[in-house]
């Protein structure tokens, strides 16, 4: 029997205090995702958007809406920000429909992405050996349990300097997998914008290509090294260059391309 990846819409709502101190609920985004770990997905999404800075900004996360068949899912989720956390409403101007291949499609402007708080990337913290780097594609694939079943999911791993896969998330969309990874780190209180440097000795490895948005998300999470099995975009290369991160593409056992930040690799 052929197993198929499930893809369902998820509508993300945010409840927050407006400028008048009134509780406001707004629909922020609809994304096509692989169900499961929706709390991590929405937490990582809001962290990457600069709407929350840590788990302390959140009081509740809950799913709601009609139960849909045949998978018995609720496809709406609401994250409530803590009382007194008055969010600048301009942060909600970046409303968009997010499909499984392009999370950034429909953004108000590319410039809005660069307005996000991006920490200063550590210039010396992370270094990985060439031989270790070459082993990572096979380790990523081994860590993708759901991909083994369906062949239809992207994977993103958090990796240590010695090549250990610390965490892997999967989703039909690369940007969702990244949000799930970042979101779990926030939910575990490992990651917050108030704790810069905690990710300085980590890297991310993506099963597909390196897009502007994925590199941006890694920068918001203060991760200095981004590698991908596929090709990077020109905007991703420019972003890595601007903020000083390492960007590797076409990573395979036999070779790879370094687009920026070669000083974090040694032979």
Predicted ranges, named:
Residues 1-156, 160-161, 165-167:
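Intrinsically disordered, low-complexity regions enriched in acidic/Ser/Thr/Pro/Gln residues
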Residues 41-46, 56, 92-94, 119-120, ...:
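Surface-exposed beta-strand edges and their flanking turn/coil or helix-capping segments
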Residues 76-88, 168-177, 220-229:
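Short, Lys/Arg-enriched charge-dense amphipathic segments
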Residues 137-205:
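A mid-sequence, solvent-exposed acidic-amphipathic segment
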Residues 159-160, 259-261:
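Short beta-strand-to-turn element immediately C-terminal to the catalytic PLP-Schiff-base lysine
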Residues 174-258, 264-267:
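Feature captures the catalytic cores and cofactor-binding loops of soluble hydro-lyases/lyases
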């Amino acid at each position: 029997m052929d197993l198929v990846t499930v893809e369902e819409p998820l509508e993300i709502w945010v409840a927050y205090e407006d400028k008048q101190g009134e509780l406001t609920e707004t629909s922020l985004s609809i994304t096509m995702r692989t169900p499961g770990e929706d709390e991590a997905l929405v937490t990582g999404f809001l962290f990457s958007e600069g709407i929350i800075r840590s788990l302390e900004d959140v009081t509740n996360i809950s799913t709601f809406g009609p139960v849909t068949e045949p998978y018995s899912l609720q496809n709406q989720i609401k994250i409530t920000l803590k009382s007194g956390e008055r969010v600048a409403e301009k942060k909600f101007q970046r409303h968009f429909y997010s499909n499984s291949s392009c999370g950034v499609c429909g953004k108000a402007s590319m410039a809005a992405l660069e307005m996000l708080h991006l920490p200063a990337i550590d210039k010396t913290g992370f270094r990985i050996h060439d031989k270790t780097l070459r082993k990572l594609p096979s380790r990523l694939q081994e860590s993708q349990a759901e991909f083994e079943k369906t062949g239809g999911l992207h994977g993103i791993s958090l990796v240590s300097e010695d090549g250990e896969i610390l965490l892997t998330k999967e989703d039909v969309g690369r940007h969702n997998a990244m949000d799930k990874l970042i979101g779990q780190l926030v939910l575990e209180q490992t990651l917050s914008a108030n704790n810069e440097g905690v990710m300085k000795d980590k890297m991310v490895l993506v099963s597909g290509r390196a897009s502007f948005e994925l590199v941006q998300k890694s920068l918001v999470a203060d991760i200095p090294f981004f590698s991908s099995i596929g090709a990077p975009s020109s905007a991703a290369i420019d972003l890595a260059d601007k903020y000083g991160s390492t960007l590797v593409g076409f990573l395979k056992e036999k070779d790879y391309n370094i687009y920026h930040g070669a000083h974090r690799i040694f032979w």
